[in-house]
Swiss-Prot record:
Residues 38-82 are mitochondrial intermembrane. It is found in: Mitochondrion inner membrane. The modification Phosphoserine is found at S67. Keywords: Acetylation, Electron transport, Membrane, Mitochondrion, Mitochondrion inner membrane, Phosphoprotein, Respiratory chain, Transmembrane, Transmembrane helix, Transport. The modification N6-acetyllysine is found at K10. InterPro entries: B12D. Residues 1-14 are mitochondrial matrix. Belongs to the complex IV NDUFA4 subunit family. The chain crosses the membrane at residues 15-37. The gene is Ndufa4. Its main location: mitochondrion. This is Cytochrome c oxidase subunit NDUFA4.
């Protein structure tokens, strides 16, 4: 398959940016899904030892991908412990 892509790129050099952007998009999507699966508190891989991982998050921990206006280090806890 890689040989076929390289052959097409040699015959039609205008396809090279297309291959680069498709490869970068696929790689970015795979990395984002891996980040969600490993670091998101909504995902629990071990239900016996950690059934509710979202309860262990502190109020100053950021688990969003990107936050524009919120400084999580200055947030205070507003609720009971469970």
């Amino acid at each position: 398959m890689l040989r076929q892509i390289l052959g097409q790129a040699k015959k039609h050099p205008s396809l090279i940016p297309l291959f680069v952007f498709i490869g970068a998009g696929g790689t970015g999507a795979a990395l984002y899904v891996m980040r969600l699966a490993l670091f998101n508190p909504d995902v629990s891989w071990d239900r016996k030892n950690n059934p509710e991982p979202w309860n262990k998050l502190g109020p100053n921990e950021q688990y969003k991908f990107y936050s524009v206006n919120v400084d999580y280090s200055k947030l205070k806890k507003e609720g009971p412990d469970f």
